[in-house]
Design a protein with these regions (language model features):
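Short coil turns that delineate tetratricopeptide repeat
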Residues: 312-313, 347-348, 381, 415-416
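Structural motif corresponding to the intra-repeat A-B loop/turn of tetratricopeptide repeats
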Residues: 287, 291-294, 329, 363, ...
Length: 434
């Protein structure tokens, strides 16, 4: 393994460096539990080394990891740990001339800019949408996060906890809501030191507002707050892990009273006004498709279609999202026109080449579809789904030789793929009877 992710306090993940790609190990190590399936993997018959760790994955686990424009090919020399600049901004001038005036101090920012620093990594939400022409690395501490990307939330009563939902939980806390912006992550978390007495330090924050406690609810000797008001809960997306419940409930088992919003997305940080319909539409299409909510996906499509033509034509992400949605709803000819336009604007985008191939196939342009599948593979040979679709095309046409060649090409890139090896063996001629 080339890299280890995590300090080991909760666990560790592992990354291999294969060619131009970083690949996540399907096995992870958990403190107190040992080895098990890594986050995001499901225990199954085949656990392959084929999950590419891209820019989105590493943004919060490594410092300024360098990738190509696709965000998948690793172009840096090595990964390094998160540095001071992630929270304090560019520091070259501060190193030369140390001064409080040339470095960002989160505690001195307004609440929105201050909380944006924490939320860039500790708020996952349902969808993260980049504004046009922006990438994750464009965010700078001191800015409002929504100038770079917007995190949309989908709130439901009893929703499973995720490992990076602390900021979302905290925002729902009545303590935060009534503090006027004074209570924030930094009130309890000091990233510059190790706690010597965690419960006592947190209690000091609590009693700064709750000086008088009910004797009936707080018997003598029960002086610490966390065990009852912020108990540990198990996140759904990571095995053998526990995070603190940041809703700060009055008592164990209490659920905050909230309106059911399962089919609506919202954000606490709106993007610039000119991007609001665009960003929400992209988020609704994405979440509606991945969570199986047709009404949400349809609402997202309507929002994007309502954008001025000039905006749609100049925004490949919008064109591709509309094309994908129309492809899934049987509007193949409209999808083809849209994805062709997106692919022309970004000819190096492997995903657009792939969706163009799918659209061509749905329009019975099989030869053109084959060429685009091959082109998508040339652009990004790490995408297993590209090979699977091309193999499916060859199976339907009875082209066993081309099928074997395509499987061999994937195995040349990833020789450890159990699934592809299994399929390749099935294509071997039967052994002669003895």
């Amino acid at each position: 393994m080339a890299y280890q992710i995590g300090s080991g306090k909760a666990g560790r993940g592992y990354i291999a460096h294969i060619g131009d790609y970083l690949i996540q190990s399907p096995a992870g190590w958990y403190n107190g539990q040992g080895w098990d399936v890594a986050p995001g993997f499901v225990a199954s018959r085949f656990l392959d080394f084929d999950r590419v760790i891209d820019n989105d994955c590493l943004y919060c686990h490594a410092n300024a990891a360098q990738f190509d424009e696709s965000g998948r090919r690793f172009t840096g020399s090595a990964l390094t740990a998160i540095s001071c600049e992630r929270c304090h901004g560019p520091s070259a001038e501060h190193v030369k001339h140390p001064s409080a005036k040339n470095i960002v101090n989160p505690a001195r920012l307004n609440a929105s800019a201050r909380d944006s620093i924490c939320e860039q990594c500790h708020l996952e939400g349902a969808a993260r949408i980049l504004n046009p022409g922006r990438n994750l690395q464009d965010y700078r501490p001191g800015d409002d996060l929504a100038r770079t990307f917007v995190i949309y939330l989908r709130e439901r009563n009893g929703e499973s906890v995720k490992a990076v939902s602390q900021a979302e939980q905290l925002a729902k806390s009545r303590c935060v809501q009534k503090s006027g912006g004074k209570l924030w992550c930094g009130s309890c978390h000091n990233p510059h030191s190790q706690r010597t007495d965690r419960h006592r330090e947190v209690r000091e924050v609590c009693v700064s507002c709750h000086a008088k406690l009910s004797p009936a609810a707080h018997p003598k000797g029960q002086w610490e707050c966390v065990s009852c008001h912020m108990p540990g809960v198990s996140p759904q997306d990571i095995l053998h892990a526990a995070i603190t419940d940041h809703r700060i409930l009055r008592y164990r088992g209490e659920e905050e009273i909230e309106q059911e919003n399962g089919d609506r997305l919202f954000t606490s940080r709106e993007p610039p006004a000119r991007f609001r319909k665009r960003d929400l539409g992209l988020a609704e299409l994405k979440v509606g498709a991945q969570d199986g909510i047709p009404a949400m996906a349809e609402a997202g499509m309507r929002l994007l279609e309502s954008l001025p033509d000039i905006e749609k034509q100049n925004d490949p992400a919008v064109l591709a999202a509309l094309a994908t949605a129309k492809l899934q709803t049987g509007m193949a000819s409209e999808a083809l026109a849209l994805i062709r336009e997106a692919a022309e604007k970004q000819p190096r985008n492997a995903s657009y080449a792939f969706y163009l191939a799918l659209a061509l196939g749905k329009n019975n342009e099989i030869a053109a579809a084959e060429r685009q599948f091959r082109r998508a593979i040339d652009l990004d040979p790490s995408r297993k789904e590209f090979f699977i679709e091309l193999c499916t095309l060859y199976i339907r046409q009875g082209r066993a030789g081309d099928l074997a060649e395509t499987i061999d090409r994937y195995l040349n890139w990833n020789p450890n793929s159990i699934g592809f090896r299994f399929q390749r063996v099935r294509l071997l001629p039967p052994e002669p009877e003895k």
